[in-house]
Amino acid sequence: MEFKQEVLDVLAEVCQEDAVKENPDIEIFEEGLLDSFGTVELLVAIENRFGITVPITEFDRDEWNTPNNIVNKLTELK
C-alpha cells in the first residue's frame, strides 16, 4: 500500500470518517472532524504506525488542515 493511502487510512480511523479519504482537501478542523484530542491521537497513531515523530510544536493547524497537507508534511518528515 502506498504511503498516502496508509496515512489516509490512519486519519479516517482517528476521525471516524471516510470523508477524509473521499475528499483529501476537506478542512478537517473547520468541518469538526478533528479536535485537539483527536490531534494528539493522530500524532500518536502516526508515530506508532510509521515511526515518524511530530513534535506538537511543529503542528500548525493551518499547515495540517487537510488530508493532503498532512500527507505532504509527513512525507517531508519521513
From Swiss-Prot:
It comes from Bacillus velezensis (strain DSM 23117 / BGSC 10A6 / LMG 26770 / FZB42). The keyword Cell inner membrane does not apply. This is D-alanyl carrier protein. Gene3D superfamilies: ACP-like (1.10.1200.10). Carrier protein involved in the D-alanylation of lipoteichoic acid (LTA). The loading of thioester-linked D-alanine onto DltC is catalyzed by D-alanine--D-alanyl carrier protein ligase DltA. The DltC-carried D-alanyl group is further transferred to cell membrane phosphatidylglycerol (PG) by forming an ester bond, probably catalyzed by DltD. D-alanylation of LTA plays an important role in modulating the properties of the cell wall in Gram-positive bacteria, influencing the net charge of the cell wall. GO terms for cellular component: cytoplasm. Belongs to the DltC family. One of its GO terms (molecular function) is D-alanyl carrier activity. The keyword Cytoplasm applies. It comes from the Bacteria. It is found in: Cytoplasm.
